């Protein structure tokens, strides 16, 4: 059987908001030989002046538009889909996450990795993690959904930070200093691991560095999701510079 000359191991269809400028380069940085990423943009109005009241409804628009992005990317016959948008993958707790995953798979007729499932798989890969803290670019209403999901998966959420982005595009503008400050605020002896959600926050390398400072797992959503996709497809290549998840598990 003939194979794609570049994606001879796997073609990944990547689904991400049209406002997102981070997930595509992040995933490409973690790409291994024989795997190619094919980005399909989910139409997303760039709402400015987002509030706690409007964030949930604004991200639901992304969920509704995801099916169009799937139909588009499936024309290149990818073997697997990787979800590059995390908020909606946590909505509705454990059952809501599974329903969203199933909706994607039923439309595409191929497997898929989503941020919520990938994050919990990553935490379990490290082992021994019970108490977590997390940060997001979201608002408290969305953080409540993330908290609910992790707690239904058996983790205790000790604390969380919502950075309250002004708009969807401005998520990528949070500085490294701001993110370091958030990590320092989250860390403590009462926390076994820290998780970062929100795929437009560039934290794949910062999280890897923070693991060294804190001597505990720091899971970046983009790292977890791409790792999950690779391992789900039997690709066990180890990568360095992105934290223990990709180099050890």
Predicted regions, residues:
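General beta-strand structural signal in soluble alpha/beta enzymes
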Residues: 39, 83, 112-116, 159-160, ...
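Periplasmic-binding protein-like
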Residues: 13, 79-84, 133-136, 191-198
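Short, well-structured alpha-helical segments in soluble
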Residues: 61-75, 178-191
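Short, flexible loop segments at boundaries between secondary-structure elements
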Residues: 165-168, 214-238
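N-terminal glycine-rich anion-binding loop in soluble enzyme alpha/beta folds
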Residues: 1-67, 135-143, 147-175
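Glycine/small-residue-rich loop that forms an oxyanion/phosphate-binding "nest" at active or ligand-binding sites
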Residues: 66, 70-112
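Hydrophobic alpha-helical
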Residues: 180-211, 225-226
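Conserved beta-alpha
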Residues: 100-166, 246-247
């Amino acid at each position: 059987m003939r194979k794609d000359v570049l994606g001879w191991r796997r073609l990944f269809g990547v689904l991400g908001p049209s406002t997102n400028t981070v997930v595509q380069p992040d995933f490409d940085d973690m790409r291994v030989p024989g795997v190619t990423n094919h980005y399909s943009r989910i139409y997303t109005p760039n709402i400015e002046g987002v509030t706690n009241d409007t964030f949930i409804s604004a991200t639901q628009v992304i969920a509704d538009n995801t099916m169009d992005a799937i139909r588009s990317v499936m024309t290149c016959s990818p073997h697997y889909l990787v979800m590059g948008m995390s908020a909606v993958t946590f909505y509705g707790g454990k059952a809501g996450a599974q329903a969203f995953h199933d909706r994607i798979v039923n439309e595409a007729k191929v497997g898929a990795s989503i941020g919520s499932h990938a994050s919990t798989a990553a935490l379990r890969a490290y082992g021994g993690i019970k108490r977590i803290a997390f940060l997001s670019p979201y608002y408290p209403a969305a953080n409540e959904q993330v908290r609910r999901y992790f707690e239904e998966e058996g983790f205790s959420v000790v604390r969380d930070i919502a950075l309250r982005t002004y708009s969807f595009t401005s998520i990528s503008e949070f500085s490294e200093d701001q993110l370091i400050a958030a990590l320092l605020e989250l860390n403590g002896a009462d926390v076994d691991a820290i998780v970062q959600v929100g795929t437009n926050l560039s934290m794949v390398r910062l999280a890897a560095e923070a693991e060294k400072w804190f001597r505990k797992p720091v899971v970046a959503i983009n790292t977890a999701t791409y790792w999950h996709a690779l391992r789900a497809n039997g690709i066990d290549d180890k990568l360095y510079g992105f934290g223990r998840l990709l180099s050890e598990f």
